C-alpha cells in the first residue's frame, strides 16, 4: 500500500467516524426538537416533523408548571459556582505553580485522593450533614458541595497550565518593578485564558446536569433545579409530559450555548497571547 492510498483510507475512515458521531449527537437533538414543536401531546419521543408546529408547549411550560422557578434557581446556583470555583482554583493553581511552601506536595496528593471518591459515595454523608446544620433545601449548601467537588482536580489542571507559562516572564516583570499581584493579574492571568474559559464552562454546566445531589438536598417543589424539575414530567409512566420535557430541555441548553459562544474568543486570545509572550 503506497502513501497516497494510505492517506485516502485514513481520510475515509476519519470522515466515516465523524459522520457516525454526528448522527449520534444530532439524532437525539432532532427528536427533542420534534417533540417540543409538534402539535399535540406525544406519549413518547418521536422523530416526526410532519404536521403543524406550535409554541404552545413553551407557553404551557411557564403557565402551568414551576419551570421559571427551576430555571432561575439553576441560573443562580450555576453563576455562583462558576464565579467562586474559578476564582478559588485559579488562585490555588497559581500558588501551587509559583510558590514553594510546607505541605505543598502532600496537599496535591491529598487532592488526588479526594478526587477518587465518587459523589454517590458521599450522598448519605451530605444528607446527614445537611440535616445536622439545617441546610436541607438551602442553595448555599448545594453550591458549596459543587465548588468543593470541583476544587481538587481543577486545581491540578490550573497548576499544570500555569506551569506552561515561562517563569522568565515573572522574573522580567519583577525586574521592572512589578509586584506579585501585578504579575499575576496583568501578565500571567491573560496567558491562561483558554483554561479559565474551560473551567468557567465546566463549573457553569454542573448544576444544569446534576440530578442526584439536588434530588437529595432540595425538598420544596419551587426550589428545585431544572434537572429534577424536568424529570418530574416523565417520572410517571401513566402521565408523561414528553412535549413539556422536550421544550424545557431546549430552553435549559440555551444558557450553556450562550456562555460557550461568549467564551470562544477567550480561547483564541489566550492562545495568541501565550504564543506572543512565550
From Swiss-Prot:
Database matches in InterPro entries: BP-dep_ABC_trans_perm, MetI-like, MetI-like_sf
Principal subcellular localization: membrane
Source organism superkingdom: Bacteria
Signal peptide annotation: none
Chain segments annotated as transmembrane: 12-32, 74-94, 108-128, 131-151, 183-203, 242-262
Domain ABC transmembrane type-1: 71-263
Disulfides per UniProt: none
Gene Ontology molecular functions: ABC-type maltose transporter activity
Localization in the cell: Cell membrane
GO biological process entries: maltodextrin transmembrane transport; maltose transport
A cellular component annotation (GO) from this entry: plasma membrane
Keywords annotated in UniProt: Cell membrane, Membrane, Polysaccharide transport, Sugar transport, Transmembrane, Transmembrane helix, Transport
A matching Pfam family: BPD_transp_1
Topology with respect to the bilayer: Multi-pass membrane protein
Complexes and interactors: The complex is composed of two ATP-binding proteins (MsmX), two transmembrane proteins (MdxF and MdxG) and a solute-binding protein (MdxE).
Functional summary from the UniProt entry: Part of the ABC transporter complex involved in maltodextrin import. Probably responsible for the translocation of the substrate across the membrane.
Family: Belongs to the binding-protein-dependent transport system permease family. MalFG subfamily.
Name of the molecule in the record: Maltodextrin transport system permease protein MdxG
Species this chain originates from: Bacillus subtilis (strain 168)
Amino acid at each position: 500500500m503506497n502513501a497516497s492510498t494510505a492517506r485516502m483510507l485514513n481520510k475515509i475512515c476519519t470522515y466515516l467516524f465523524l459522520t457516525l458521531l454526528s448522527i449520534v449527537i444530532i439524532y437525539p437533538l432532532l427528536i427533542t426538537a420534534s417533540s417540543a414543536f409538534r402539535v399535540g401531546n406525544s406519549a413518547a419521543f418521536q422523530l416526526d416533523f410532519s404536521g403543524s408546529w406550535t409554541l404552545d408547549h413553551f407557553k404551557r411550560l411557564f403557565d402551568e408548571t414551576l419551570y421559571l422557578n427551576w430555571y432561575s434557581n439553576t441560573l443562580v446556583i450555576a453563576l455562583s459556582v462558576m464565579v467562586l470555583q474559578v476564582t478559588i482554583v485559579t488562585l490555588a493553581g497559581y500558588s501551587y505553580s509559583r510558590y514553594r511552601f510546607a505541605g505543598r506536595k502532600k496537599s496535591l496528593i491529598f487532592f488526588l485522593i479526594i478526587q477518587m471518591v465518587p459523589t454517590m459515595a458521599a450522598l448519605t454523608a451530605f444528607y446527614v450533614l445537611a440535616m445536622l446544620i439545617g441546610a436541607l433545601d438551602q442553595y448555599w449548601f448545594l453550591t458549596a458541595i459543587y465548588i468543593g467537588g470541583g476544587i481538587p482536580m481543577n486545581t491540578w489542571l490550573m497548576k499544570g497550565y500555569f506551569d506552561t507559562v515561562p517563569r522568565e516572564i515573572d522574573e522580567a516583570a519583577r525586574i521592572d518593578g512589578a509586584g506579585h499581584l501585578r504579575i499575576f493579574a496583568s501578565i500571567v492571568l491573560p496567558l491562561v485564558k483558554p483554561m479559565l474559559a474551560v473551567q468557567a464552562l465546566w463549573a457553569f454546566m454542573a448544576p444544569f446536569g446534576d440530578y442526584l445531589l439536588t434530588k437529595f438536598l432540595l425538598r420544596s417543589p419551587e426550589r428545585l433545579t431544572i434537572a429534577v424539575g424536568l424529570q418530574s414530567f416523565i417520572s410517571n409512566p401513566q402521565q408523561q409530559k414528553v412535549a413539556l420535557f422536550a421544550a424545557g430541555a431546549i430552553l435549559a441548553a440555551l444558557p450553556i450555548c450562550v456562555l460557550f459562544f461568549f467564551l470562544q474568543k477567550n480561547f483564541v486570545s489566550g492562545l495568541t497571547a501565550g504564543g506572543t509572550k512565550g
